[in-house]
């Protein structure tokens, strides 16, 4: 999750699950807008990032994945990830199932868990991050077999409580994925 500290004007991240087994962004950031550019500075000055976003047309949509339900046995698991549509570009991310991620709790690096046969490569790669540029065909993915396939954009449903769901296959089994609309609305 992105965490905004309004009092200190700092942006930080609360990451529960990620592909690697560590905090990728341990330091908060200050943000400065200059025209259509957003500059991110670390308080220690260890890095500066230039988030230059040129104006373009097309949809901008984020769906945040927060849980899945196994359709055969009804078990519900917390998950992380989501679908991002930014104009002609699409990205999908999905964390590992908890029973896989839990195997990694005693490790700081994936290669250590792999070397000790606690987890295999298929389980490591079950954390999906797939990117499609200028269309729906995946060009980059942590799951190499997904390259060339389409990101699944069909089958979304909105129930009476306003919850967005989609049935997806995870490890060859059907899960009902629960999403919430994720967007930023400036004040």
Question: What residue spans do the PLM features occupy?
Answer:
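Lipid interaction determinants
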Residues: 1, 9-187
């Amino acid at each position: 999750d992105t965490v905004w500290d309004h009092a200190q004007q700092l942006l930080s991240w609360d990451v529960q699950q990620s592909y690697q087994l560590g905090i990728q962004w341990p330091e908060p950031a200050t943000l400065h807008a200059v025209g259509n550019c957003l500059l991110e500075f670390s308080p220690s000055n260890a890095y500066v990032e230039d988030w230059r976003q040129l104006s373009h047309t097309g949809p901008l949509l984020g769906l945040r994945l927060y849980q899945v339900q196994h359709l055969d046995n009804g078990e519900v698991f917390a998950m992380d990830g989501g679908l991002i549509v930014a104009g002609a570009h699409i990205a999908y991310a999905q964390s590992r199932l908890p029973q896989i991620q839990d195997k990694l709790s005693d490790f700081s690096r994936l290669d250590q868990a792999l070397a000790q046969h606690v987890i295999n490569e298929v389980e490591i790669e079950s954390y999906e991050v797939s990117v499609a540029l200028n269309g729906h065909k995946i060009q980059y993915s942590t799951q190499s077999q997904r390259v060339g396939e389409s990101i699944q954009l069909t089958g979304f449903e909105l129930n009476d409580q306003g919850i967005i769901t989609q049935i997806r296959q995870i490890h060859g089994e059907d899960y009902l994925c629960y999403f919430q609309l994720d967007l930023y609305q400036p004040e």
